[in-house]
Each structure stands twice: as C-alpha cells, then as structure tokens.
Amino acid sequence: VIRSLPQEELKGKYKYKDFETALKCRSCHPGIYEQWSQAMMSQAYTHHWDEIEYFDLAVPHSEVDPFMKEAVDGCNGCHAPLAYMGGTLPPPRPEEKSMANESVSCEVCHLVQRATADPPVNYSYFIEPGRTKYSGREPEIQSPAHKIEQNDFLKTTEFCGNCHNEMNPYGIWVKSTQLEWKEGPYGKEGVTCHECHMPRGEYQMALMGKTYSDMRLHLFHGAHDPGKVRGTIELRIEPDIRLAEPGETVVFTVALFNQKTGHKFPTGSVEDRIAWLDVEATDAKGNKYHLEVDKKGFEGEEYTISGDYLAYQDMAIPLKLNDFKGVQRDGIPHGNRIFRMPYFDEQGNMTIMQWNTRSLGVDYRIGPRETKVEKFTFRLPYEVAPGEMKVRAVLNYQLLVKPVADFLKVPAEESEIMMVNEHFTKIEILP
C-alpha cells in the first residue's frame, strides 16, 4: 500500500490569487484560448462525468474509508490543479464557478519547470507561480504582460506524463498513457505526444506577436473528439470461401491495425472505456445474422468477449447500497470481441473506480502499429436466402460503458457509440 503520493507537498502550497485566469491570457492570445476552450483540458474539472465520478463516487468513498482521502484529494492535482495547490478540497462544485473551474489552464502548463518523479506520475510537476512563463520556443520578443523563458521540458512526453500517468494508493498503474508511448515504436522514434495532439501549423501566437509557420496548436484533441477517434484502427475482413451452400461453414477473418495512436487504444481512463468488434451478415432477403467471435483460449479471455455478466459492485460503497448486485458489465450484443483491460477491486469484481483498483486483468487493447486478427466461424443457416450475402465488420468505441452511465445518470453523450472504422465483404450463397 502506497500511503504517500509524489506531490503531497503541493497541497495548499499556493493561493488562488497567485495564478492568472485563462481569460486574462485570452486578451493577448485569443486564438490559443479558443482552441483550449474547446478541448477537455478546459473541462478537466467541469465535465459532467468527471463531476459525477468525483462527487458521487470518489468523495463519498473517502468519507466511508478515510484511507482514500489522500488519493481522492489528489484527483484535483490534475483535474483542478489550482484548487489542489490552494488547499480547497474538495473544491466547490462547478456550478459555484470557483477558480477550480479553470481546470488545466494556461498557467498550469506554462508555469511548470520540470518533473519531480521518474517516471512522471500523479501531478509530479514542479511549478512556481510568478511573472515568468515557460515556453518550448525561444522568444523573439518579450511580452509586456509577462517574462518568457524557453524550457525544453515542455517539449517532452515527461511533461505530459505528469498527469497522463497515474498510480493509485495500492501501487497500481491505473493510467499509463505516457509509459505506453515510451515502450512503443513512437517512443523509440521520438515522435512525441505533441506531434498528434498539438500539431504544428501557421498561426499567430499573440496579437502583438509574429506569425510562425510551425506553431504548436493547442488543440489537445483526443478520446472525446469523434474526429480524432475516427480511423484510429484500420479494418479489413475477408472470407475463406466466396461461394457457399446453406449449411456450409464460412470463416471470416478480421485484421485490425492501429495505424494512428502512439499509445494503446483505448488508453487513459481504461477502466471506463471499451472498443468492440461487431460482425453482421445480411442475406439477399435482408435477414441479418450476428456473428460471434471465435475464442482464442488465452487467460482472462472471458473479459474480452461480451456477455451477460454483472460487474462494478463496489459502487455500493460510496453509494451506500445494500445487496447491490452490480450492473451489466458490457451493455453491448453478446459474442463481440472487446478491446479493453479490466480493473478489479479487492473482491475480484470489475470496477470503474480506479482509486479502488487492486489488480489489473488481461490487457487486450491494441498497441501502436499492432495488428489484432480475429476470426468468426459462421455456419450458414439452411434457410439462408440464395444470392449475395454482405458482411460488415465495424469497430465501435465508448468512453463509458452504457450500463454504468445509465445507472449513474451520466448525460448520454458520454456513452454514445463512436464508430472507429468499418469494412465490408461479401459471399455468394448458392441455391
């Protein structure tokens, strides 16, 4: 059990008034502000699911079990850093419009000088408020509003890892996006987080500044951006035979190639997220047949094939529920292949409460440039219509499994199905 998190000394170290608001930065950097305001960085504290998870699950859990308080306070080290550094814990709810609502603001990133942990984890940033702001670029002119100092640390993935790696009180890596990057091909090639999430483009950095051809845009687009998710994985499906008779067996093979992410997919809040492969055949008369994935036989595979299972029983602790049986684990059609890594509580039940995670299950996510191959063995029904049979493979993605979202009354957009990709093939059914 890890009872001390890396940055406990940050708690209450500063005051709200030590930091500028993002709106003040907007007066000189309007474009950058608008980019940031559309990204999850600006909503890390105010986003509806984060608010529900924190105030309905995390805070009540820490009241039931005081051991959890340090970790639950620590959520704010990355979701509401100004509140954490101001010692206002838990912070006021978003509706109260406190400085906690600044979320991950301009100041939070541009006052960071280095990491205090290796690997970086749990808000391990060294930060000092003041007139000096740090940039990855050597300034050509100085701002009248503040001093600019170049700092290469802002260009590293370790900078991002301060918050995109997380270890819970039990020593479990419950978020490891930067570590996944480091272990993969993008890390070995030096293709940083910034290349995908802060791409370079021609842009005017400040109203009184020059236009650069290679400015880092502050888009921060990720899992909540359907346009970013779309196309992450390439799909191809093919049959083993093209002509088949009713009653005959056809094997469809699907290749899923991660051609877009430098980390695993899904990543981040992995306890919440699923991607799943759904294969459906439609015969010449429009009859539809759902195909179930072939089992491979690896340990923990049962968590990667959708079915009728209850999970997330530990929500009963913060919600103070008696005889709570849990909710459906997956909430999708049975027999689909799921790309996920399950998180388990002390009782061995799956959990979406990362602070309560005691162990991790099989990691069946898709790594960077990895190709997963899945097979679907389909015995054609005798009543299948002769003619062309179309077969569609689609990879879907959900930020939060729908049964949990419905149970906690999370706004529907958090469990909306995002289509990652699809591919079609066909066979001919003989009379």
Predicted regions and their residues:
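An acidic-aromatic substrate-binding cleft motif
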Residues: 18-22
